[in-house]
Amino acid sequence: GALLCPFLIAAAGRVSTGLALLVLAALGVIVWLIYLTTPMDGQGSTRSKTGKEKIDWSFLHSVQFWLLTGLLFCQNAAEQSVTGWMVTYFKGSGIITGALAAYTVTVMWGATLVARLLIAFVFPFKQPRKAMVVMGVGCTIFYFFLMQAHTQGAAILLLFAFAFAMAGMNPTAVASAGKMTSVTSMGIMLPAASSGAILMPWIIGRVAERAGLAMGMACNIVPCIGLVLFAILVARMPEEN
């Protein structure tokens, strides 16, 4: 969806801006209907003697749960900051111009799609925790060089590499939660982690207002390093069944 949506909206926008907005609204309604009709009963809870469901809150005492939440927080922060600010950064710096700048998100999600399909069907992780460390290091290195890019080709290539390295982090981290995964635990982990996608782009904007967008984008190296640190901490912990 993220790969194809920019093309769909661009096609609708050629007809009229109103149609593009209507297409977006229709897609939002479809998402709402999917959530509305998804069964979510019974998982992560047990029945008490009175017959009422008793929610299992034991995951809140797990250090691994909070480390994985922190890792996902950094992943969301780094990824959404690039998604939200990179077009503005590329255009403002003159690195990428014209229609290509608008399709940087498509480049990212194209890399994400390719990487996740490879992980799922061709090269599945035998040691997912160590793989998260490697992915975190890869994201940090590629983002550093992305900020040094001064040509259109290098920028697109490094953006693809950054997204490729980031692609497996989210599903691998969620899968690493093991039996802690439930409706209740995910209802805490995912919103808490998603706050990174709100906070970091805001921080970049505030820094950009005072020191320029290049400095703001440089701040995004912090959650990239956070990915590495949290991944190392998770890798050192004993697995929880």
Identify the residue ranges that each predicted region occupies:
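Helix-loop-helix hairpin linking two adjacent transmembrane segments in secondary transporters
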Residues: 1-43
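A membrane-interface helix-boundary motif in multi-pass transporters
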Residues: 11-25, 205-224
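Juxtamembrane intracellular "pre-TM" segments in multi-pass secondary transporters
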Residues: 38-68
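Extracytoplasmic gate region of multi-pass secondary transporters
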Residues: 61-114
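Helix-to-loop junctions at the C-terminal end of transmembrane segments
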Residues: 115-127, 208-209
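Structural signature of the two symmetry-related core transmembrane helices
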Residues: 130-145
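Intracellular juxtamembrane helix-capping segments at the cytosolic ends
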Residues: 166-181
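A late C-terminal transmembrane helix in Major Facilitator Superfamily
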Residues: 180-213, 217-220
